[in-house]
Swiss-Prot record:
Species annotation: Pongo abelii (Sumatran orangutan)
Superkingdom, natural source: Eukaryota
GO annotation (BP), single: apoptotic process
Region described as Mediates targeting to the mitochondria: spans on this chain: 209-273
Segments of this protein annotated with the region Disordered: 1-24
EC identifiers of the protein: 1.1.1.-
Subunit structure: Interacts with TP53, p73/TP73 and MAPK8. Interacts with MAPT/TAU, RUNX2 and HYAL2. Forms a ternary complex with TP53 and MDM2. Interacts with ERBB4, LITAF and WBP1. Interacts with DVL1, DVL2 and DVL3. May interact with FAM189B and SCOTIN. Interacts with TNK2. Interacts with TMEM207. Interacts (via WW domain) with VOPP1.
Residues binding substrate, per UniProt: S260
Protein name: WW domain-containing oxidoreductase
Keyword set, alphabetical order: Apoptosis, Cytoplasm, Golgi apparatus, Lysosome, Mitochondrion, NADP, Nucleus, Oxidoreductase, Phosphoprotein, Repeat, Tumor suppressor, Ubl conjugation, Wnt signaling pathway
Cell compartment(s), UniProt: Cytoplasm; Nucleus; Mitochondrion; Golgi apparatus
Gene responsible for this protein: WWOX
Protein task: Putative oxidoreductase. Acts as a tumor suppressor and plays a role in apoptosis. May function synergistically with p53/TP53 to control genotoxic stress-induced cell death. Plays a role in TGFB1 signaling and TGFB1-mediated cell death. May also play a role in tumor necrosis factor (TNF)-mediated cell death. Required for normal bone development. Inhibits Wnt signaling, probably by sequestering DVL2 in the cytoplasm.
């Protein structure tokens, strides 16, 4: 069913499939009961498992509940213009067993972004996602757009960004989504994006720093910095600097920085424990693509932590996330070896919807309101590397980032 797919559900049997002749229904209060059409009777317990259940959360965005003349509950999907007696929340039922508390976390590595947003309405909220024309950035943007948010795709390639916008509008023609040019490898482009955004006179509730480059051959940007470092860290740092006044005025607001578990396999300090710029923006002779990526991801966590320390008193929180292991996306396309590696690993990886889940969780979870300075993997907080926890390194990186921008743009840095 299209409506169920939109709600983040599949029209497939669940693990506790009903026997032939049985139907699952819900009361208007959310309790699940089972109708046996063969014997014309109903019961609260599942006919196979014996469990009682109730649906979790509110109805998906765009749905409404009603009661017909016979007292039976029905559901209206205003987006797809259809009515059904099947509760769209039935895929998200929870056991009604208060005597057996569970410590299982609410979401995990198999959760999708749409499942996290199930029942949420983001009408009136503005979300910016960098690198949103494909991969987890696209799924992040789509998930928020399908739940009422005004979503801006900040992308370098406008042709692909326009295609991404069209794909979202195909799923829901009323989605409020647009694309704006942002090239993180060019500081002037970051500046122009910020100016274009501010000209819209809209708030900014969620900023997702998602864009990244991986496995590039060594090159310098027009700003004279190694490309991986500028795209993955410095460009996002500058973007947040330029938009922080809007974020603060829109508080409570959230910044999500997409990092990676690979941040654990490197350091950016020298043997004396001091931040080493040559490790961040190395020469061609000292460059190794994987190491450059790992270092940029360490910068992401350090930046997110320091940003939270600075802006949380003004109502802006920041968290860093790891989206998932070896997900198949365009990030690997720069070298055939990585393409082969990602292809071989594909059967064991997350889907893009699952990869976007941790980002969306940190951007939307009510239980994280006002909380930040943390690192998440599989929708669960975990400790980053000891290097990523260094407040001194984070402060030094912040000061260095400011200086690099000032040296290149001078008084026009904003």
């Amino acid at each position: 069913m299209a409506a169920l797919r939109y709600a983040g559900l599949d029209d497939t049997d669940s693990e506790d499939e009903l026997p032939p002749g049985w139907e699952e229904r819900t009361t208007k209060d959310g309790w699940v009961y089972y109708a046996n059409h063969t014997e014309e009777k109903t019961q609260w317990e599942h006919p196979k498992t014996g469990k009682r259940k109730r649906v979790a959360g509110d109805l998906p965005y765009g749905w409404e509940q009603g009661t017909d003349e016979n007292g039976q509950v029905f559901f209206v999907d205003h987006i797809n213009k259809r009515t059904t007696y099947l509760d769209p929340r039935l895929a998200f039922t929870v056991d009604d067993n208060p005597t057996k508390p569970t410590t299982r976390q609410r979401y995990d590595g198999s959760t999708t972004a749409l499942e996290i947003l199930q029942g949420r309405d983001f009408t009136g909220k503005v979300v910016v996602v960098t690198g949103a024309n494909s991969g987890i950035g696209f799924e992040t943007a789509k998930s928020f757009a399908l739940h009422g948010a005004h979503v801006i795709l900040a992308c370098r390639n406008m042709a692909r960004a326009s295609e991404a916008v069209s794909r979202i509008l195909e799923e829901w023609h009323k989605a409020k989504v647009e694309a704006v040019t942002l090239d993180l490898a060019l500081l002037r482009s970051v500046q122009h994006f910020a100016e274009a955004f501010k000209a819209k006179n809209v708030p900014l509730h969620v900023l997702v720093c998602n864009a990244a480059t991986f496995a590039l051959p060594w090159s310098l940007t027009k700003d004279g910095l190694e490309t991986t470092f500028q795209v993955n860290h410095l460009g996002h740092f500058y973007l947040v600097q330029l938009l922080q006044d809007v974020l603060c005025r829109s508080a409570p607001a959230r910044v999500i920085v997409v990092s990676s578990e690979s941040h654990r396999f490197t350091d950016i300090n020298d043997s004396l424990g001091k931040l080493d710029f040559s490790r961040l923006s190395p020469t061609k002779n000292d460059y190794w693509a994987m190491l450059a990526y790992n270092r940029s991801k360490l910068c992401n966590v350090l930046f997110s932590n320091e940003l939270h320390r600075r802006l949380s008193p003004r109502g802006v929180t920041s968290n860093a996330v790891h989206p998932g292991n070896m997900m198949y996306s365009n990030i690997h396309r720069s070298w055939w070896v990585y393409t082969l590696l990602f292809t071989l690993a594909r059967p064991f990886t997350k889907s893009m919807q699952q990869g976007a889940a941790t980002t969306v969780y940190c951007a939307a979870a009510p239980e994280l309101e006002g909380l930040g300075g943390m690192y998440f993997n599989n929708c669960c907080r975990c400790m980053p590397s000891p290097e990523a926890q260094s407040e001194e390194t984070a402060r030094t990186l912040w000061a260095l980032s400011e200086r690099l921008i000032q040296e290149r743009l001078g008084s026009q840095s904003g």
